[in-house]
Amino acid sequence: MTSDTEGSRAFYCQVFGWTAEEPAGEFGGYVNFTKEGIRMTGCMASQPGSGVPDVWSVYLATEDAEKTLAAAATHAGQVHVQAMAVGDLGTMAFVTDPGGAGIGLWQPGRHQGFGVLGEPGAPSWFELHTRDYEAAVGFYRTVFGWDT
């Protein structure tokens, strides 16, 4: 989410060599970035005056967004965006973990997720900084089945 869509488009295209697609009207002006024709990430404008800072969001894959939302809510997470279809691309939702970190959920449709890995400009690592380590570890183990 950004307060300067045009500036963000120019920045990421120049720094990472991405190409910005034209904003998709049916998705509220959402901009997809591609690398060599493969979708990498997206960008949307924040609401003016919302006080929300510019921020990146990470989406974790799930086979069933509704089931994962229920598990998150049961294990001290908060649901902020209920599962919703994003055209035929997939289904998204958004939660915060017990420490307050935001995390998106992505149930793939036509868009499976990252198509480019291990190259400059491609995602390579995500790291959680949390106020409540034990609660966060328990949440991700239980909700997503992760080992730590």
Each language-model region and where it sits:
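Glycine-rich acetyl-CoA-binding "A-motif" of GNAT/NAT acetyltransferases
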Residues: 39, 54, 102
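DNA polymerase sliding clamps and clamp-related checkpoint/processivity subunits
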Residues: 42-49, 58, 80-81, 85, ...
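Short glycine-rich, polar/acidic loop-and-turn segments at beta strand-coil junctions
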Residues: 22-24, 37, 44-47, 64
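Vicinal oxygen chelate
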Residues: 1-3, 31-33, 47-71, 73-128, 148, ...
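Core segments of cupin and vicinal oxygen chelate
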Residues: 1-39, 74, 82-90, 97, ...
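Short, low-complexity, polar/charged sequence segments that are solvent-exposed and flexible
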Residues: 38-41, 60-63, 79, 122-126, ...
